[in-house]
Amino acid sequence: MTWQIVFVVICVIVAGVAALFWRLPSDDTTRSRAKTVTIAAVAAAAVFFFLGCFTIVGTRQFAIMTTFGRPTGVSLNNGFHGKWPWQMTHPMDGAVQIDKYVKEGNTDQRITVRLGNQSTALADVSIRWQLKQAAAPELFQQYKTFDNVRVNLIERNLSVALNEVFAGFNPLDPRNLDVSPLPSLAKRAADILRQDVGGQVDIFDVNVPTIQYDQSTEDKINQLNQQRAQTSIALEAQRTAEAQAKANEILSRSISDDPNVVVQNCITAAINKGISPLGCWPGSSALPTIAVPGR
Protein backbone atom coordinates (compact mmCIF):
# COMPACT_ATOMS: atom_id res chain seq x y z
CA MET A 1 0.00 0.00 0.00
CA THR A 2 1.36 3.42 -0.97
CA TRP A 3 1.88 6.21 1.54
CA GLN A 4 -0.64 8.34 -0.35
CA ILE A 5 -3.45 5.84 0.14
CA VAL A 6 -2.56 5.60 3.86
CA PHE A 7 -2.98 9.35 4.25
CA VAL A 8 -6.20 9.24 2.20
CA VAL A 9 -7.65 6.69 4.63
CA ILE A 10 -6.59 8.76 7.63
CA CYS A 11 -8.12 11.91 6.15
CA VAL A 12 -11.38 10.09 5.37
CA ILE A 13 -11.61 8.82 8.94
CA VAL A 14 -10.96 12.31 10.33
CA ALA A 15 -13.53 13.77 7.93
CA GLY A 16 -16.10 11.18 8.98
CA VAL A 17 -15.66 11.86 12.68
CA ALA A 18 -15.75 15.63 12.12
CA ALA A 19 -18.89 15.27 10.01
CA LEU A 20 -20.64 13.52 12.91
CA PHE A 21 -19.88 16.45 15.21
CA TRP A 22 -20.99 18.80 12.47
CA ARG A 23 -24.36 17.09 11.97
CA LEU A 24 -25.10 16.30 15.62
CA PRO A 25 -27.05 18.88 17.66
CA SER A 26 -24.54 21.09 19.48
CA ASP A 27 -23.55 24.71 19.90
CA ASP A 28 -22.65 26.80 16.87
CA THR A 29 -18.93 26.98 17.71
CA THR A 30 -18.51 23.21 17.83
CA ARG A 31 -20.44 22.71 14.63
CA SER A 32 -18.41 25.42 12.86
CA ARG A 33 -15.12 23.83 13.92
CA ALA A 34 -16.35 20.38 12.88
CA LYS A 35 -17.38 21.74 9.50
CA THR A 36 -13.94 23.29 8.97
CA VAL A 37 -12.16 20.05 9.92
CA THR A 38 -14.43 18.02 7.65
CA ILE A 39 -13.78 20.23 4.63
CA ALA A 40 -10.01 20.33 5.31
CA ALA A 41 -9.80 16.55 5.72
CA VAL A 42 -11.74 15.94 2.50
CA ALA A 43 -9.51 18.40 0.64
CA ALA A 44 -6.37 16.74 2.01
CA ALA A 45 -7.70 13.32 1.02
CA ALA A 46 -8.29 14.59 -2.52
CA VAL A 47 -4.74 15.99 -2.71
CA PHE A 48 -3.16 12.74 -1.50
CA PHE A 49 -5.36 10.76 -3.88
CA PHE A 50 -4.19 12.94 -6.77
CA LEU A 51 -0.52 12.55 -5.79
CA GLY A 52 -0.94 8.78 -5.74
CA CYS A 53 -2.09 8.76 -9.36
CA PHE A 54 1.40 9.41 -10.79
CA THR A 55 4.83 7.82 -10.65
CA ILE A 56 8.23 8.48 -12.23
CA VAL A 57 10.50 5.66 -13.40
CA GLY A 58 14.21 6.46 -13.45
CA THR A 59 16.57 6.29 -16.41
CA ARG A 60 17.54 2.77 -17.54
CA GLN A 61 14.97 1.23 -15.20
CA PHE A 62 11.79 -0.77 -15.49
CA ALA A 63 8.95 -0.62 -12.97
CA ILE A 64 6.73 -3.58 -12.17
CA MET A 65 3.18 -2.55 -11.22
CA THR A 66 1.31 -4.43 -8.49
CA THR A 67 -2.21 -4.06 -7.11
CA PHE A 68 -2.38 -4.94 -3.41
CA GLY A 69 0.82 -6.96 -3.82
CA ARG A 70 -0.30 -8.88 -6.91
CA PRO A 71 1.62 -8.24 -10.17
CA THR A 72 -0.61 -6.80 -12.88
CA GLY A 73 1.63 -8.01 -15.72
CA VAL A 74 2.47 -4.44 -16.68
CA SER A 75 6.04 -3.12 -16.78
CA LEU A 76 6.72 0.59 -17.16
CA ASN A 77 9.76 2.03 -18.90
CA ASN A 78 11.52 5.20 -17.78
CA GLY A 79 9.47 8.37 -17.62
CA PHE A 80 6.23 9.78 -16.16
CA HIS A 81 3.27 7.39 -15.81
CA GLY A 82 -0.25 7.43 -14.43
CA LYS A 83 -1.69 4.79 -12.06
CA TRP A 84 -4.21 4.30 -9.27
CA PRO A 85 -3.15 5.27 -5.74
CA TRP A 86 -3.53 1.68 -4.49
CA GLN A 87 -1.10 0.45 -7.11
CA MET A 88 2.63 0.25 -6.31
CA THR A 89 5.66 0.22 -8.62
CA HIS A 90 8.79 -1.84 -7.99
CA PRO A 91 11.96 -0.73 -9.84
CA MET A 92 14.11 -3.22 -11.77
CA ASP A 93 17.47 -2.22 -13.24
CA GLY A 94 17.29 -2.20 -17.05
CA ALA A 95 20.89 -1.13 -17.70
CA VAL A 96 23.58 -3.42 -19.08
CA GLN A 97 25.10 -5.30 -16.15
CA ILE A 98 28.81 -6.17 -15.96
CA ASP A 99 29.40 -8.74 -13.24
CA LYS A 100 32.95 -9.79 -12.36
CA TYR A 101 33.88 -12.83 -10.32
CA VAL A 102 37.51 -12.22 -9.39
CA LYS A 103 39.83 -12.16 -6.41
CA GLU A 104 40.39 -8.73 -4.92
CA GLY A 105 42.42 -8.61 -1.73
CA ASN A 106 40.92 -11.01 0.79
CA THR A 107 37.67 -11.31 -1.17
CA ASP A 108 37.62 -14.24 -3.58
CA GLN A 109 34.53 -14.48 -5.81
CA ARG A 110 36.06 -16.68 -8.51
CA ILE A 111 33.92 -19.56 -9.77
CA THR A 112 35.04 -23.10 -8.98
CA VAL A 113 34.97 -25.46 -11.97
CA ARG A 114 35.79 -29.15 -12.33
CA LEU A 115 38.13 -30.04 -15.17
CA GLY A 116 38.41 -33.04 -17.46
CA ASN A 117 41.26 -34.55 -15.41
CA GLN A 118 38.97 -34.56 -12.34
CA SER A 119 40.83 -31.67 -10.70
CA THR A 120 39.28 -28.34 -9.72
CA ALA A 121 40.26 -24.80 -10.65
CA LEU A 122 39.26 -21.22 -9.86
CA ALA A 123 38.17 -19.23 -12.91
CA ASP A 124 38.21 -15.44 -13.23
CA VAL A 125 34.93 -14.70 -15.01
CA SER A 126 33.12 -11.62 -16.26
CA ILE A 127 29.70 -11.49 -17.90
CA ARG A 128 27.66 -8.74 -19.60
CA TRP A 129 23.89 -9.14 -19.51
CA GLN A 130 20.69 -7.10 -19.56
CA LEU A 131 17.16 -7.69 -18.35
CA LYS A 132 14.45 -7.94 -21.02
CA GLN A 133 11.57 -5.57 -20.27
CA ALA A 134 8.95 -8.01 -21.55
CA ALA A 135 10.16 -10.63 -19.05
CA ALA A 136 10.39 -8.21 -16.10
CA PRO A 137 6.91 -8.97 -14.61
CA GLU A 138 7.55 -12.72 -14.71
CA LEU A 139 10.99 -12.31 -13.17
CA PHE A 140 9.56 -10.09 -10.42
CA GLN A 141 6.91 -12.69 -9.65
CA GLN A 142 9.55 -15.44 -9.46
CA TYR A 143 12.41 -13.63 -7.74
CA LYS A 144 10.84 -10.47 -6.20
CA THR A 145 14.03 -8.36 -6.35
CA PHE A 146 16.69 -7.57 -8.93
CA ASP A 147 19.45 -8.92 -6.68
CA ASN A 148 17.64 -12.25 -6.49
CA VAL A 149 17.54 -12.32 -10.30
CA ARG A 150 21.32 -11.81 -10.38
CA VAL A 151 22.07 -14.46 -7.75
CA ASN A 152 19.54 -17.17 -8.55
CA LEU A 153 19.21 -16.80 -12.32
CA ILE A 154 22.49 -15.39 -13.66
CA GLU A 155 25.13 -16.63 -11.22
CA ARG A 156 23.67 -20.10 -10.78
CA ASN A 157 23.23 -20.76 -14.50
CA LEU A 158 26.64 -19.25 -15.27
CA SER A 159 28.29 -21.68 -12.86
CA VAL A 160 26.41 -24.61 -14.42
CA ALA A 161 27.41 -23.57 -17.96
CA LEU A 162 31.08 -23.13 -17.03
CA ASN A 163 31.25 -26.51 -15.33
CA GLU A 164 29.64 -28.12 -18.36
CA VAL A 165 32.24 -26.80 -20.81
CA PHE A 166 35.25 -27.24 -18.51
CA ALA A 167 34.29 -30.87 -17.86
CA GLY A 168 35.64 -31.66 -21.34
CA PHE A 169 38.83 -29.62 -20.89
CA ASN A 170 42.02 -31.46 -19.94
CA PRO A 171 44.73 -28.97 -18.94
CA LEU A 172 47.42 -31.65 -19.42
CA ASP A 173 46.60 -32.17 -23.10
CA PRO A 174 49.62 -30.87 -25.07
CA ARG A 175 47.26 -29.15 -27.52
CA ASN A 176 46.03 -26.92 -24.70
CA LEU A 177 49.61 -25.84 -23.92
CA ASP A 178 50.18 -24.37 -27.38
CA VAL A 179 47.07 -22.17 -27.67
CA SER A 180 44.90 -21.00 -24.77
CA PRO A 181 41.48 -22.70 -24.94
CA LEU A 182 39.87 -20.18 -22.55
CA PRO A 183 38.30 -17.90 -25.23
CA SER A 184 36.57 -20.80 -26.97
CA LEU A 185 35.41 -22.30 -23.65
CA ALA A 186 33.98 -18.93 -22.58
CA LYS A 187 32.13 -18.60 -25.90
CA ARG A 188 30.60 -22.07 -25.49
CA ALA A 189 29.53 -21.20 -21.94
CA ALA A 190 27.83 -18.03 -23.25
CA ASP A 191 25.97 -20.09 -25.88
CA ILE A 192 24.74 -22.52 -23.22
CA LEU A 193 23.66 -19.63 -21.01
CA ARG A 194 21.68 -18.06 -23.86
CA GLN A 195 19.82 -21.34 -24.37
CA ASP A 196 18.94 -21.52 -20.66
CA VAL A 197 17.95 -17.92 -19.86
CA GLY A 198 17.87 -16.17 -23.24
CA GLY A 199 14.11 -15.72 -23.08
CA GLN A 200 14.38 -13.54 -19.97
CA VAL A 201 17.74 -11.78 -20.24
CA ASP A 202 20.14 -10.85 -23.02
CA ILE A 203 23.58 -12.46 -22.63
CA PHE A 204 26.12 -10.35 -24.52
CA ASP A 205 29.33 -12.18 -23.68
CA VAL A 206 31.21 -14.27 -21.13
CA ASN A 207 34.96 -13.89 -20.62
CA VAL A 208 37.40 -16.14 -18.76
CA PRO A 209 40.77 -14.32 -18.90
CA THR A 210 42.63 -16.54 -16.42
CA ILE A 211 42.24 -19.74 -14.47
CA GLN A 212 44.10 -21.00 -11.40
CA TYR A 213 44.69 -24.75 -11.25
CA ASP A 214 45.26 -26.71 -8.06
CA GLN A 215 48.90 -27.23 -7.05
CA SER A 216 49.12 -30.80 -8.34
CA THR A 217 47.89 -29.85 -11.81
CA GLU A 218 50.12 -26.76 -11.86
CA ASP A 219 53.18 -28.91 -11.07
CA LYS A 220 52.34 -31.35 -13.86
CA ILE A 221 51.91 -28.50 -16.35
CA ASN A 222 55.31 -27.10 -15.34
CA GLN A 223 56.90 -30.52 -15.83
CA LEU A 224 55.33 -30.82 -19.27
CA ASN A 225 56.60 -27.38 -20.22
CA GLN A 226 60.12 -28.28 -19.05
CA GLN A 227 60.05 -31.50 -21.05
CA ARG A 228 58.81 -29.61 -24.11
CA ALA A 229 61.65 -27.08 -23.68
CA GLN A 230 64.22 -29.87 -23.38
CA THR A 231 62.79 -31.56 -26.45
CA SER A 232 63.06 -28.30 -28.39
CA ILE A 233 66.70 -27.92 -27.32
CA ALA A 234 67.49 -31.51 -28.32
CA LEU A 235 65.82 -31.07 -31.72
CA GLU A 236 67.75 -27.85 -32.31
CA ALA A 237 71.02 -29.56 -31.34
CA GLN A 238 70.21 -32.41 -33.70
CA ARG A 239 69.57 -29.98 -36.56
CA THR A 240 72.83 -28.15 -35.77
CA ALA A 241 74.81 -31.41 -35.79
CA GLU A 242 73.26 -32.46 -39.07
CA ALA A 243 74.09 -29.07 -40.61
CA GLN A 244 77.69 -29.28 -39.32
CA ALA A 245 78.12 -32.77 -40.71
CA LYS A 246 76.81 -31.64 -44.05
CA ALA A 247 79.19 -28.66 -44.03
CA ASN A 248 82.14 -30.92 -43.21
CA GLU A 249 81.17 -33.22 -46.02
CA ILE A 250 81.05 -30.32 -48.46
CA LEU A 251 84.42 -29.06 -47.21
CA SER A 252 85.96 -32.51 -47.57
CA ARG A 253 84.78 -32.77 -51.15
CA SER A 254 86.09 -29.29 -51.96
CA ILE A 255 89.54 -30.18 -50.57
CA SER A 256 89.69 -33.32 -52.67
CA ASP A 257 88.72 -31.38 -55.77
CA ASP A 258 90.97 -28.35 -55.16
CA PRO A 259 94.13 -28.62 -52.93
CA ASN A 260 94.42 -24.84 -52.98
CA VAL A 261 91.60 -24.77 -50.42
CA VAL A 262 93.94 -26.41 -47.90
CA VAL A 263 96.68 -23.89 -48.69
CA GLN A 264 94.26 -20.98 -48.28
CA ASN A 265 92.97 -22.29 -44.94
CA CYS A 266 96.57 -22.83 -43.75
CA ILE A 267 97.61 -19.30 -44.72
CA THR A 268 94.57 -17.81 -42.96
CA ALA A 269 95.25 -19.78 -39.77
CA ALA A 270 98.98 -18.87 -39.82
CA ILE A 271 98.30 -15.17 -40.24
CA ASN A 272 95.73 -15.21 -37.44
CA LYS A 273 98.30 -16.81 -35.10
CA GLY A 274 101.25 -14.63 -36.22
CA ILE A 275 103.11 -17.61 -37.76
CA SER A 276 104.93 -17.56 -41.08
CA PRO A 277 102.79 -19.12 -43.84
CA LEU A 278 105.84 -20.36 -45.84
CA GLY A 279 105.23 -23.97 -44.93
CA CYS A 280 101.65 -23.98 -46.24
CA TRP A 281 102.62 -24.72 -49.92
CA PRO A 282 102.86 -28.37 -50.86
CA GLY A 283 106.49 -29.47 -51.51
CA SER A 284 107.93 -26.54 -49.58
CA SER A 285 110.84 -27.41 -47.27
CA ALA A 286 110.25 -24.29 -45.15
CA LEU A 287 108.77 -24.71 -41.76
CA PRO A 288 106.36 -22.25 -40.24
CA THR A 289 108.22 -20.05 -37.78
CA ILE A 290 107.07 -17.87 -34.97
CA ALA A 291 107.66 -14.20 -35.53
CA VAL A 292 109.96 -12.70 -32.89
CA PRO A 293 109.20 -9.05 -32.21
CA GLY A 294 112.11 -6.65 -32.85
CA ARG A 295 114.07 -9.03 -35.17
Curated annotation (Swiss-Prot):
Membrane topology qualifier: Multi-pass membrane protein
Enzyme Commission designation: 3.4.-.-
Transmembrane parts of this sequence: 2-22, 37-57
GO cellular component: a single term: extracellular region
Keywords, comma-separated and alphabetical: Cell membrane, Cell wall, Hydrolase, Membrane, Protease, Secreted, Transmembrane, Transmembrane helix, Virulence
Keyword Glycoprotein: no
Stretch forming the signal peptide: none
Gene Ontology terms: biological process: proteolysis
UniProt GO MF annotations: peptidase activity
Record protein name field: Protease Rv3090
Phylogenetic classification of the source organism: Bacteria, Bacillati, Actinomycetota, Actinomycetes, Mycobacteriales
